Amino acid sequence: MDTLTTRFAARLERAGLCPPGRALVAAWDDTIGFSRPDPLTPVLAEAMERLGVGCLILAPAAEPYRTILEWQAAREAPAICPRDCETRTFFHDIPVVPDPTPEAMVAALSRRKGAYLPGYGILAHGALSPEQAFVTVSSVAFAGFVKFFTDALERVRQGRLDAPWRGALTRVVAALPPAPPEQPPRLAEGPFATRTEAVAAMVAAGRATVELGLVDSVFGNISYNIDGVLGISQTGAALDTLEGCLDWCPLDGSSCAGLTASSELASHAALARVDGRRAILHGHPKFAVIMSMDCPETACPERGNCHTRCPRPRFLGETPIVPGEVGAGPRGLVHTMPPALVGRAGVIVLGHGVFTAGRDDFNEALASLCAIERQARADCLSALAV
């Protein structure tokens, strides 16, 4: 069990979510095992037993997430309330845990998957495995980041970015990783005639997307169309470890392989039917999501429902921004994303992420994803004057 817990602690570090040697992962086997010794291990063990879960993670946040989450927790307790797609889908809000006790942890985690403990880090539980808790830690960090910058942009627009806010913003910007490169690494050139070739290309493109910071590994998806059969990442598959996690789904619906495919299968299939490009890449680059949520129409009657009902054509440069929730429901992005992407390099789904496409391989799709995120980051920091 120590091997399992230390593996997930190392994964948190590689993802840039936690400083080296700081993650505390607890998981059940015949007893509760921990990734490292810590004075809080008895507290986490008692919280796990009360919750009846298989795993509990306490992840001290790496910068800039630490500055962001400490800032938000101090000002928004008892709960941080982001508005991005991941929060709407997974959390509703992020409880702020008032003290490092089993009682306080259980009170928060009995109603939410993740929480924030000021001075300590992100708390997350998994009913069965550390993978579930890892996903939650990643989502809390992403949601906090997006909320911090969308709040800052709104304050600039309202003339309310005061000195404390400016100081926090300066610290966060100083800790940002580099922007995506103008020339991303070259990937295999298509078209790919066999599934073996396409799988290798998707594995490499998924890994590059994660390494460039364009998606957290547990989110996003990827597909490639070979003669009307769509190879697509499975639901919950990590983009940087796609080996064995791809399904082949006929576009004519003649197979049930799509049962384990990405939740965005319907959107990928809809795009494949109307666009001749074979390669589709979907990431969650943070600044593109942030800028998609930045709107000057404060009196809009759909304010608060922007992610599904935005009534106005919006763009980031030449890239359209469309509403649409996850899946194929009546307000699903399956209805908005495909027509917007036809003939364009990419499209941003409001509060969610970016879809791009390439004719024969993933080089064009990856380059477009980088370019959209670079422009979004530049526009955001320019608007904030930092």
Feature annotation, model-predicted:
Residues 1-386:
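Glycine-rich flexible loops
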